[in-house]
Amino acid sequence: MTRVKSKLDEELSSPWFYTVCTMGGMLSAGTTHLAITPLDVLKVNMQVNPVKYNSIPSGFSTLLREHGHSYLWRGWSGKLLGYGVQGGCRFGLYEYFKTLYSDVLPNHNRTSIYFLSSASAQIFADMALCPFEAIKVRVQTQPMFAKGLLDGFPRVYRSEGLAGFHRGLFPLWCRNLPFSMVMFSTFEQSVEFIYQKIIQKRKQDCSKAQQLGVTCLAGYTAGAVGTIISNPADVVLSSLYNNKAKNVLQAVRNIGFVGLFTRSLPVRITIVGPVITLQWFFYDAIKVLSGFPTSGGVKKPVDAAKLSV
């Protein structure tokens, strides 16, 4: 048993495993974000102009009436490529840092490992995403700005230089770091809870279909909780990109405390919950097809008295 466990640990820290995780993250994040581009267009416009776009049904009606169906897919290339790159870094580096921190911090509890791993991965993931996000938000809210990435990148560079591509990096970190930390930790804890308290079986004793079902349930829970935590920074980010405010402090004053937590929250939950669920499902399905177990658990559980999932 020890030899089998040791062999599995070696496989889960191999270059091939991290490659699979990175590719799985790219495919799952890029495709799911592409699929919900119309909702994202509505969300960004609700954040920038909440009076005009004050609900999901009326917001869609206004966009369709004024701009047509094609407008709902503006920024699709930024969604596909930007969030694909971000997803590869987020998932691939999370697995790497989780193994690393489990080895160098053996006496810390698992929640600390999840927080540190997800935060470390997200820092690099957002640095990769930021240039794409800078173009995407402008394309979605400023009809005359550009059609997509090809003409959007040169325009930002001419008007703002390289700094324009990373103008929103700090608020992006403020949005995504709490989201990622809460999302990954909630996912891991949810997986453990489902196996121990609901199914009451070890992961390896469940079928692959059951394991993927657990992944979906834990993924939706993680996405919903993370959305609420990250909503204020998401609203501020849209305000900055559309020149509604010169800095974060001014944006917060303009939006108001209540608005930070409520503006566009319903549409964000509508978007993020299913998206995170599908991301985890596709991600774990790719891992299973590659011969690896589904996600959940650390390499070296700190509390040996409990079953590791």
UniProtKB/Swiss-Prot annotation:
A single cellular component GO annotation? mitochondrial inner membrane
Expression triggers: By salt stress.
Please cite one Gene Ontology biological process associated with this protein.
response to salt stress
Q: In which tissues is it expressed?
A: Expressed in stems, leaves and flowers. Strong expression in the stamens of flowers.
- Per the record, what ranges lie on the membrane's Mitochondrial matrix side? 37-74, 133-167, 230-268
Q: Where are the transmembrane segments?
A: 16-36, 75-94, 112-132, 168-187, 209-229, 269-289
Indicate the principal place this protein occupies in or around the cell.
mitochondrion
Pfam families to which the protein is assigned, alphabetical = Mito_carr
The UniProt entry lists membrane topology as:
Multi-pass membrane protein
Q: Where in the cell is it found?
A: Mitochondrion inner membrane
Topology, Mitochondrial intermembrane side: 1-15, 95-111, 188-208, 290-309
Q: Which controlled-vocabulary keywords does the entry list?
A: Membrane, Mitochondrion, Mitochondrion inner membrane, Repeat, Transmembrane, Transmembrane helix, Transport
Q: What is this protein for, i.e. what is its function?
A: Transport of phosphate groups from the cytosol to the mitochondrial matrix. Mediates salt stress tolerance through an ATP-dependent pathway and via modulation of the gibberellin metabolism.
Give the similarity note.
Answer: Belongs to the mitochondrial carrier (TC 2.A.29) family.
Recite the other comments. Plants overexpressing MPT1/PHT3;3 display increased sensitivity to salt stress.
- What is the protein's name according to its record? Mitochondrial phosphate carrier protein 1, mitochondrial
Highest classification ranks of the organism: Eukaryota, Viridiplantae, Streptophyta, Embryophyta, Tracheophyta
Gene field: MPT1
